């Protein structure tokens, strides 16, 4: 049923009054938004994870949480997202609350260190205020806070060792996210919170794992990624990296509960070529016969490691295979990104 002329006139007057009071664009019809309906994304550096996320990466203008055990690849993944944003002409910032940033490893992950903004704040309040100022500048594309557990309230730092201050960090995070959420959406910045796991005492049923910082981040995050190391990669007796599995625990922009697996190598971060071989083989773009890999009728090499080195030395061919994978996989992500089994063993409960 069409809107009557009287209602249309009253609605137009109300919208005009809202625009005058709160600024142009405060309210609008979705049909007039046009091209802005599509969700923009920044790639993660792993094509498997881009597919699992459903939109080709992490969404702009949203809060992202990456959590997992120690040495599982949380910071590596965040640094690859910064590197991808820089390749697109964007600006990245790294708020190092843990005071453990390694510029050499970040460069190996593809981050342009000379253009990266780095801050090592003294308190949690300072870290979140710096984040807010960067967001409101509308000039930064990716902001990484490493980590939520290291955002220590000022009162705790100034107090004595052993002082009990329950809930203070949770209140800090809740207040900060209330202030930040609207500004993040308007700025189109991706704000990534890296979080750690803790164990809950006395849990008899379900997972005893919990993330730090209270409940607020769980609600404000549009995407929550659970990253775990599932295998140690070795060359002979020497460990050269890890194979990790990422589960999309929450996703507001595409179907959740998908998962992705990829290699993280000590000397380069996420192995782009290894990821392309795995996904290309699953989709049938790369054909495997015995130990040999083929692209069409062209032989790529014998053994996965040899093919990985071949693709690394032939970036144009790698780009072409990646283009074919994205064209095929992003139209049907569920065909390549299986759903994760989210049960008691995998669920993470927040404090």
From Swiss-Prot:
The keyword Cytoplasm applies. GO terms for cellular component: cytosol. One of its GO terms (biological process) is DNA repair. ATP binds at residues 68-75. Keywords: ATP-binding, Cytoplasm, DNA damage, DNA recombination, DNA repair, DNA-binding, Nucleotide-binding, SOS response. It holds the Pfam family RecA_C. Disulfide bonds: none annotated. It is found in: Cytoplasm. The keyword DNA-binding applies. InterPro entries: AAA+_ATPase, DNA_recomb/repair_RecA, DNA_recomb/repair_RecA_CS, P-loop_NTPase, RecA-like_C, RecA-like_N, RecA_ATP-bd, RecA_C_sf. GO terms for molecular function: ATP binding; ATP hydrolysis activity; ATP-dependent DNA damage sensor activity; damaged DNA binding; single-stranded DNA binding. It comes from the Bacteria. Transmembrane segments: none annotated. Gene3D superfamilies: P-loop containing nucleotide triphosphate hydrolases. Can catalyze the hydrolysis of ATP in the presence of single-stranded DNA, the ATP-dependent uptake of single-stranded DNA by duplex DNA, and the ATP-dependent hybridization of homologous single-stranded DNAs. It interacts with LexA causing its activation and leading to its autocatalytic cleavage. PANTHER family: MITOCHONDRIAL DNA REPAIR PROTEIN RECA HOMOLOG-RELATED (PTHR45900:SF1), RECA (PTHR45900). Belongs to the RecA family. This is Protein RecA.
């Amino acid at each position: 049923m069409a809107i009557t002329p009287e209602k249309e006139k009253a609605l137009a007057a109300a919208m005009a009054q809202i625009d005058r009071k709160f600024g142009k664009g405060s309210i609008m019809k979705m049909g007039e938004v046009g091209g802005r309906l599509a969700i923009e994304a920044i790639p993660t550096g792993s094509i498997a994870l881009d597919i699992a996320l459903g939109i080709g990466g992490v969404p702009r203008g949203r809060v992202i949480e990456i959590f997992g055990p120690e040495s599982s690849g949380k910071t590596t993944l965040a640094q690859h997202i910064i590197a991808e944003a820089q390749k697109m002409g964007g600006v990245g910032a790294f708020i190092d609350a843990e005071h453990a940033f390694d510029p050499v490893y970040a460069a190996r992950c593809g981050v342009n260190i000379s253009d990266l903004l780095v801050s090592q704040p003294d308190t949690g309040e300072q870290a979140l205020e710096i984040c807010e100022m960067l967001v409101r500048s509308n000039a930064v594309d990716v902001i990484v806070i490493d980590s939520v557990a290291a955002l220590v309230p000022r009162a705790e730092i100034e107090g004595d060792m052993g002082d009990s201050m329950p809930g203070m960090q949770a209140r800090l995070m809740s207040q900060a996210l209330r202030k930040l959420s609207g500004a993040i959406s308007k700025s189109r910045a991706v704000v990534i919170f890296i979080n750690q796991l803790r164990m809950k005492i006395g849990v008899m049923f379900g997972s005893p794992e919990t993330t730090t910082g209270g409940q607020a981040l769980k609600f404000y995050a549009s995407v929550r990624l659970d990253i775990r190391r599932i295998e140690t990669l070795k060359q002979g007796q020497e460990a050269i990296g890890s194979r990790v599995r990422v589960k999309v625990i929450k996703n507001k922009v595409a179907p959740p509960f998908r998962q992705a697996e990829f290699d993280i190598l000590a000397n380069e971060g996420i192995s782009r070529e290894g990821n392309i071989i795995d996904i290309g083989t699953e989709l049938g773009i790369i054909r495997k016969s015995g130990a040999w890999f083929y692209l069409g009728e062209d032989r790529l090499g014998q053994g996965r490691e040899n093919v990985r080195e071949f693709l690394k030395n032939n970036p144009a061919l790698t780009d072409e295979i990646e283009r074919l994978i994205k064209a095929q996989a992003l139209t049907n992500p569920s065909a390549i990104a299986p759903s994760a089994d989210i049960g008691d063993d995998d669920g993470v409960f927040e404090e």
